[in-house]
Structures are given as C-alpha cells and as structure tokens.
C-alpha cells in the first residue's frame, strides 16, 4: 500500500508526537484505586435522614483533590437503605449558592413527595418529606432534578443510591452484607483537565460524553471480596452514555434484579447493557477465580488519546469498570444460586388504554411539544394499566415517574432476558411497547414527569407531565 505525500507527512508527524508523549497518554494513566464505599445511611426507629447538599473536596485520579459538589461532605451521596412498611423522613438542606431540586428515581411515591421543580430549594432552604415505603425490594437512586440544570447538577455530584429492602430480600440466600459481599457500583463518564478538575460544556445537541470512566468517584477501581457470590448493584449515573458490560474472562453475569425489583429467577447474561438511569443487580461467582474485571467495551487507542490532547474526545481512555480480587475470606453466602426469587403474576383488572408517544431530539420534544409546566400532557387513573407505544427519531433512554412497566416488545420483537422484570427506565432504539401500571397518584400542581433520561435533553424540554387521579376519584 502506498502513501500520498500528505498522508506520509501526517503519519510522520503523529509518530514524532507519539514518541514525545508522556507515558500517561501512551498507557493507562490511572493506577488501580480501592473502590470507595459510600457511607450507609439507614433509618432506625423513625430517626430522620439528613442530606446536606454542599461543596466538597475529592480526588478522581488519586492525586489532586479538587472542588466538587456532593452530599454530606462526599462526592456523590451516602447509600440510603429503607425498609418496606416504614415511613422515612428525609431532610434535604441546600448549602449551595443556587437553587436545587432533588428526587428519588424508582421510589413509588405520590406526586406531592416526588420532588423536582415543585420542590425547588433556594440557597439555605430545606425540604423534609416523610416518604412511605410501600414497594418490593429494589435498587433506586436519588439525584438532582433541577429545572434546566439537572445535567450540570448530576455531573457535579448530586446523586446517590437508595436501597429498598423487604421480606423477600431478607429471606433469600443472596449476598446482603453492605460493603462485604454487596456493593454499590455507580458509573459516570467525565472529562478531567490536567489537574483532575471535571470539565463540563453542554453539547449543542444530544448529551454530554466524557473520555474518563469514573466508578464511585474514581478511575480504575478494585475491590477485595470473599470467595463465593458477590452482589453488584449497578447504576448508570452518566448524563448520556450507555454501557455494554461484560466480564473479562467471558463468563456470564447472573442478573437478579432490575429497576423496580428482583426478577422471578436469575438470568445468565453474557453482555449487560446499562442505559442512563438504569439499575441492574448482578451476581458474580468468585469461588474459583483469583480476579476478574468488568469492562465496558473497547478503550480509546493511542491515536485517539493523542487527538484528545487537541480536541475533546468522546472515547473512553479506559473501559475497566471494576476489578474484583478474591481474598482468603470464606464466603458469607454458601448456598447455591436460588432457582426462584420472587413471584410475579400481576392481575390486570381494568381495560388497557393505548397511547402513542414520539420522542424527538432536543428541538422536537415529545409528540412535537417541548415541556410546558402549565400544561398536563397525559391524565390517567391510579391502578390503571396502559399500553404505551413509544417511537424515537434518536435512540435514547426513557423514564416515567410514579409507575412501573414491563417491556412487551422492541421493534416488534420480544425483549432480551436483561429487559425482563419491572422497570421504570428503558433504552429505546426506534420503537418500544410498554405495559404501564399507574401505581401512585399525582396532581395538577404536583404532576409526575416522563422524559428522556439523557439529562441535557430533559433540560431542553424533552419531557411531559402526567396526572394520575387517585383511586376512586
């Protein structure tokens, strides 16, 4: 193959640059870091849970500590654990210099308690909802939901995990010792400058994509685990990036839960997609291996990294999510993987209404309408079942507050096993059909939202408002 004069000059120039590059660019720039474990915050005896939204200092690369936002003095927030049947008081306090709104994605709450724009906190203000926990065990997440600023606030660090436990989750022989065999794994992508400071420039369209994979606030983490089953609660808290996860040794994950709770039975999944806002619970068998890594596709080449010195890159420098290292500790869960987890036999007692929604890009909104907070887009009834047929001109994740749904089909085909179970967030590429169950009431002044989970797109109005009239109304 012959090279033109221009190609030869370009190749020679790049080769000279590569020779002069620091090792940090030619190889993985980050050394393995122990996985940070968010503090566990658990309601006991009716005591309130305090969540101070404030500035903090944090190091993403294990070197420079930089100013970030977070909760209770940490980048990201503590892991909240609540129990079905409890009434839990959360006290959010805004210690920042701008307005902030918060919500808990996945918690099935009335519209009055959902948060968001109707519960905006000015600097120095607090919001103290008492939330009834009345749903099956699930992995949820709380995060900023500030009008027109959600993307920037979540990127800055206003997010954390919320775990719901119930009798089933306590009864089943699953790993459940937080930080020992049960770990939160929060994925984000960022763009860091030479000092480790996160850079954020809203893209002209679509959503923000960084070049550095961050897990629980650090690059390239590892965690030491006991031999046996390890439970990972995966959350994609990225603004827009979707991940395809797999184990480095080719073994499958055993998925046991999704957004709205445990699956009827474990499902072996070779590749695990994880869209923004989605949660997945998986088990990994560490009984016969020394270590294994979770990866998220191919990392950027040296050439890509070189280009990234001169212009922002959207390719991840490293795609290692987390490395599990087996220690000499005996497993806390010695049972075999259970064949059945929870029952799932919903009773549909009403006629099913169909709705058509078209998700556009940032300029088109939903059904050709940008969000208008004075307009209610959909009205339904608590307990109702509906069939939502959603089409997209741009592949994107979609979320509905206050409901749970099952995926009936993608583009006319049955969903893959990883999309079984009850969900509240789903990746849609062209067309999806959902069976939606209206679980909680909402009101004209406190409506639910449904929206693109690409955070920049919801900030631009790719969203709608849903009122669910109370049962018997």
UniProtKB/Swiss-Prot annotation:
Residues 1-27 form the signal peptide. InterPro entries: Cu-oxidase-like_N (IPR011707), Cu-oxidase_C (IPR011706), Cu-oxidase_fam (IPR045087), Cupredoxin (IPR008972), FtsP (IPR026589), TAT_signal (IPR006311). The keyword Cell cycle applies. Keywords: Cell cycle, Cell division, Periplasm, Signal. Its main location: periplasm. One of its GO terms (molecular function) is oxidoreductase activity. Predicted to be exported by the Tat system. The position of the signal peptide cleavage has not been experimentally proven. One of its GO terms (cellular component) is cell division site. It is found in: Periplasm. GO terms for biological process: FtsZ-dependent cytokinesis. The keyword Cell cycle applies. Cell division protein that is required for growth during stress conditions. May be involved in protecting or stabilizing the divisomal assembly under conditions of stress. Belongs to the FtsP family. PANTHER family: BILIRUBIN OXIDASE (PTHR48267:SF1), CUPREDOXIN SUPERFAMILY PROTEIN (PTHR48267). HAMAP family: FtsP. This is Cell division protein FtsP. The gene is ftsP.
């Amino acid at each position: 193959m012959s090279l033109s004069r221009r190609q030869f000059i370009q190749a020679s120039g790049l080769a000279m640059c590569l020779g002069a590059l620091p090792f940090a660019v030619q190889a993985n720039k980050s050394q393995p870091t122990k996985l940070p474990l968010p503090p566990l915050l658990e309601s006991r005896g009716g005591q309130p849970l305090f969540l101070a939204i404030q500035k903090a200092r944090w190091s993403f690369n294990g070197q420079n500590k930089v100013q970030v936002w977070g909760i209770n003095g940490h980048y990201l927030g503590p892991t909240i654990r609540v129990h079905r049947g409890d009434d839990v008081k959360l006290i959010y306090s805004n210690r920042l210099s701008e307005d902030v709104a918060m919500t808990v994605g996945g918690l099935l709450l009335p519209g009055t308690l959902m948060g968001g724009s109707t519960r905006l906190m000015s600097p120095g203000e607090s919001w103290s909802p008492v939330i009834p926990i009345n749903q099956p065990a699930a992995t949820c997440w709380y995060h900023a939901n500030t009008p027109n600023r959600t993307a920037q606030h979540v990127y800055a660090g206003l997010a954390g995990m919320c775990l719901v436990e119930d009798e089933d989750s306590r009864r089943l022989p699953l790993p459940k010792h937080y930080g020992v065999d049960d770990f939160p794994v929060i994925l984000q992508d960022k763009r860091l400058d030479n000092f480790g400071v996160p850079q954020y420039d809203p893209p002209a369209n679509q959503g923000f994509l960084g070049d550095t994979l961050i897990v629980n606030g650090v690059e390239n983490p590892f965690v030491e685990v006991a031999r046996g089953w390890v439970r990972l609660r995966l959350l994609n808290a990225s603004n827009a990036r979707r991940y395809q996860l797999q184990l480095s040794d080719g073994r499958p994950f055993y998925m046991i839960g999704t957004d709205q709770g445990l699956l009827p039975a474990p499902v072996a999944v070779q590749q695990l997609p994880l869209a923004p806002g989605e949660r997945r619970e998986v088990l990994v068998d560490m009984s016969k291996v020394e270590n294994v890594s979770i990866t998220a596709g191919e990392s950027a080449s040296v050439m890509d990294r070189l280009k990234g010195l001169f212009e922002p890159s959207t390719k991840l420098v490293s795609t290692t999510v987390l490395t599990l290292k087996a220690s000499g500790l005996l497993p806390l869960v010695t049972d075999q993987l259970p064949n059945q987890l929870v029952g799932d036999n919903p009773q549909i007692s009403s006629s099913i209404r169909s709705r058509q929604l078209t998700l556009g890009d940032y300029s088109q909104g939903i059904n050709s309408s940008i969000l208008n907070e004075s307009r209610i887009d959909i009205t339904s009834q608590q307990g109702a079942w509906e069939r939502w047929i959603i089409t997209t001109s741009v592949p994107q994740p979609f979320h509905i507050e206050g409901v749970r749904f099952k995926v009936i089909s993608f583009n006319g085909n049955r969903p893959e096993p990883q999309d079984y179970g009850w969900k509240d967030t789903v990746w849609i590429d062209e067309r999806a059909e959902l069976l939606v169950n209206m679980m909680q009431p909402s009101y004209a002044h406190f409506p639910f939202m449904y929206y693109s989970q690409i955070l920049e797109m919801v900030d631009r109005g790719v969203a709608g408002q849903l009122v669910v009239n109370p049962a018997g109304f």
